[in-house]
């Protein structure tokens, strides 16, 4: 923890830990409080979803932890809206990140620590593999990421869950503070809990320590994804981009290999803040662009995606709002 905080440059004046009340995030708060660099203040951010009957008790436990550590606790209450085309897990996660960003703005915090650990990382890789994710998805969770103007740090991605639980037991024995238990963590109706309770035990029995191997795989995928992204960026720069990257040369794009065409399209869409399409949808756009006649002008090409329109005119491919 101390090494992760020292690596921040410039050193932040304020840090926050996202704390649910469970053992993982609570012990991250304990570790952060112990390793806090001079001149830096710490806060605990708690998001109250109201999804569990014990949600009020969880909030009270977080306040108790804050009092124990001498750290202020800030709470945001959110309602997880149904029917966004997301499952309950994904909808709650989205609401949680939005609430954390709001708390960060309110308190002038730029960096938030998250308690994801090696076992979480391994579960994420397995889930994404089973869902058929691509290279970037197989990189799983990054030690550092930015979202909504907030820098999220995951200093425990290489820490085994057993070590965290051992620390929680020591804190309970010494201070009497008890972490809450989220019943969804072991409810197999939820995908992650199904991996944790049904798949992981079989892997533990056959391949002890498999989480470290899978986490290493995620790091390797992250490196490969970074290389692919750099190649895509370099390729796109050769496509004669114009109008702040809104358009590029169809003829130049056609000069790329099929795999690099697809990556250049992904880079282009991401640079224009367009949601990333599925592999099938992207393949359809690629097919249409490759089949346009040589002049690259086809008024019938209107590939629509997430409120945006891709069109081709005078040999250039455009994206419009």
From Swiss-Prot:
Determine if Zinc-finger is one of this entry's keywords: no
Cystine crosslinks: none
Q: Give any single GO term for biological process.
A: tRNA modification
Cellular component GO terms, alphabetical: cytoplasm
Look up the signal peptide feature and give its range: none
Answer yes or no on keyword Cytoplasm. yes
Give the UniProt subcellular location, in the record's own words: Cytoplasm
* UniProt EC number: 6.3.4.19
Keywords of this entry: ATP-binding, Cytoplasm, Ligase, Nucleotide-binding, tRNA processing
The membrane-spanning stretches of this chain are none
> Which family does the similarity line name?
Belongs to the tRNA(Ile)-lysidine synthase family.
What does the entry note on its domains? The N-terminal region contains the highly conserved SGGXDS motif, predicted to be a P-loop motif involved in ATP binding.
Put simply, this protein is called tRNA(Ile)-lysidine synthase
> Gene that codes for this?
tilS
């Amino acid at each position: 923890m101390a090494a992760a905080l020292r690596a921040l440059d410039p050193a932040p004046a304020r840090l926050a830990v996202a704390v649910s009340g469970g053992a993982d995030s609570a012990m991250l708060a304990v570790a952060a409080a112990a390793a806090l660099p001079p001149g830096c203040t710490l806060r605990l951010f708690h998001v109250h979803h109201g999804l569990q009957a014990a949600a009020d008790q969880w909030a009270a436990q977080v306040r108790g932890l804050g009092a124990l550590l001498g750290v202020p606790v800030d709470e945001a209450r959110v309602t997880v809206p149904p029917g966004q085309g997301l499952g309950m897990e994904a909808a709650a996660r989205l609401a949680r990140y939005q609430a954390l960003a709001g708390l960060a703005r309110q308190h002038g915090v730029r960096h938030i620590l998250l308690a994801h650990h090696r076992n979480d990382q391994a579960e994420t890789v397995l889930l994404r593999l089973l869902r058929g994710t691509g290279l970037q998805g197989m990189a799983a969770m990054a030690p550092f990421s930015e979202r909504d103007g907030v820098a999220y740090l995951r200093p425990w991605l290489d820490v085994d869950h057993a070590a965290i639980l051992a620390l929680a037991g020591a804190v309970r024995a010494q201070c009497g503070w008890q972490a809450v238990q989220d019943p969804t963590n072991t409810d197999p109706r939820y995908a992650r809990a199904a991996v944790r309770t049904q798949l992981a035990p079989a892997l533990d029995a056959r391949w002890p320590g498999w989480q470290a191997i899978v986490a290493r795989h995620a790091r390797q995928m992250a490196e490969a994804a970074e290389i692919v992204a750099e190649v895509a960026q370099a390729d796109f720069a050769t496509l004669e981009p114009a109008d702040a990257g809104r358009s590029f040369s169809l003829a130049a794009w056609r000069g790329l290999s099929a795999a690099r065409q697809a990556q250049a399209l992904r880079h282009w869409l991401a640079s224009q803040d367009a949601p990333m399409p599925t592999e099938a949808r992207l393949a359809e756009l690629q097919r249409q662009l490759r089949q346009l006649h040589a002049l690259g002008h086809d008024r019938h090409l209107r590939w629509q995606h997430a409120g945006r329109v891709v069109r081709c005119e005078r040999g250039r491919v455009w994206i419009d709002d």
